[in-house]
Amino acid sequence: NEQDSRHYAIAAKVPMLEPSDSQEALEFTKRAFQLSEEYHTPVIVRMCTRISHSQSIVTKGVRQEVPKRAYVKDPERVMMTVNSLKAHYRVEERTRAMTAFSETTELNRVEMGDTALGIITSSTSYQYVKEVFGDRASVLKLGLSWPMPVEKIKNFAAQVDQLLVIEELEPIIENHCRQIGVEVMGKEKIPMVDELTQGVIARSLGQEAKPWVRLEEDIPGRPPVMCAGCPHRGVFYTLAKNKCMVYGDIGCYTLGVMPPLNALDLNICMGASCSGLHGFNLAGGAEHEKHSVAVIGDSTFAHSGITGIADIAYNRSNSTVLILDNSITGMTGHQQNPTTGRNLRGEPAGQIDLEALCRAVGFDRVRVVDPNDLKAMDKALKEELAAEEPSIIISRRPCVMLKSVKKAPPLTVDLDKCNGCGLCMKIGCPALSLRGEKVEIDRTQCVGCQVCMQMCHRDALLP
């Protein structure tokens, strides 16, 4: 259900390349730079989910060194009114040239098979088509998906009895074919929602899908969940307990929406939590201010949260923002950021002082809390929501997956004291499970954070 970014190429009138495997991802990136230089244009290389998450052996080829060129000033590239009109002419001329190129380039290729059925496709859908049909259909593969060829499509259509477009999401190729007078089948057969697979395509066309090959080992499912010992867990438990409206942001903490926490109410894009909360509270007034918060990670805050809290402070919005400082950019693979004190190479670098920054933009109420201390977290949240001014709570504890973080020994369960009440299960830790009427701790996952111990009223969980 990813966005169909092909629309951007059409709206901006810039070429788009769509690789269908790992090798093409490499080759098309090279071609993108070549086309950019030749046609003086940005080029989009569209990577869909399956291409990005797949891997295969690639042939690298010989590295080409590009000589540096002197920078030359060109005031016509500044889009003032007088220049924008000239630029529009250049864009239209470039589009005509790129369309002519699309007719002859090897990026768009025809693979003739049985002529009873012709299929036009692109991206990962091409791989599914080849797996389902093999030589039982002729295929026009569009590696350059915008601008699309006109004559090439018409010529291909003339060589087959029936023409079908197989593409994920929107009917963009299908609509193009109809606009140039080529009759095709498309979304009346192929789903518009969710990603395609070999099975989806086969069943959509009334064919029998190949059976899945089952793994010999029965691997248990792994639903999206915050890691055992994640410092965000105590924050979201506290927010859920206090029935807060939580405006989320982009990061591991987006998983706060998952059960049993069910703590997140809104999530749009990086930085939207702070400015969104500000607008929400301005619109809702005092009724909303006392139970609404924004949550944003330290790296997302450095990326685009600072302007949002500046707006809150400047307008004296009675809003509470929680900055979840786990000392790293967690979700995308532990990259450094301006709050960690190291650059992307791991070298010492300047470090943003979050408390000082928040005070500098106008917050008088700034406090730091350890999120694994549930009582302290609850106290801080209640006090800041009750305050009649903007406030910041910095939830500070390193990501448990950092190599520098020492894990405590796993906890144990006193089975004589445990009555299976399930209170500890409310934090949603993957190291905890109910086996029969008793709680069980997975010692391979437990990092001894002791958050669950604070939930147990019978002292049944022990370090």
Where are these regions (language model features)?
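Short, glycine/polar-rich helix-capping loops at beta-to-alpha or helix-loop-helix junctions
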Residues: 1-5, 127-129, 148-152, 173, ...
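Thiamine diphosphate
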Residues: 257-394, 405
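Conserved thiamine diphosphate
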Residues: 1-42, 48, 82, 290, ...
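Acidic-glycine-rich active-site phosphate/pyrophosphate-binding loop
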Residues: 5, 243-258
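Flexible, low-complexity linker and terminal segments
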Residues: 19-226, 231-235, 240-244, 248, ...
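Short secondary-structure boundary/capping segments
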Residues: 3-7, 59-64, 135-136, 179-181, ...
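Glycine/charged-rich beta-loop-alpha catalytic/anionic-binding loops adjacent to active sites
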Residues: 10-18, 219-221, 254-267, 286-292, ...
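Short glycine-enriched loops at secondary-structure junctions
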Residues: 1-3, 122-125, 249-252, 325-328
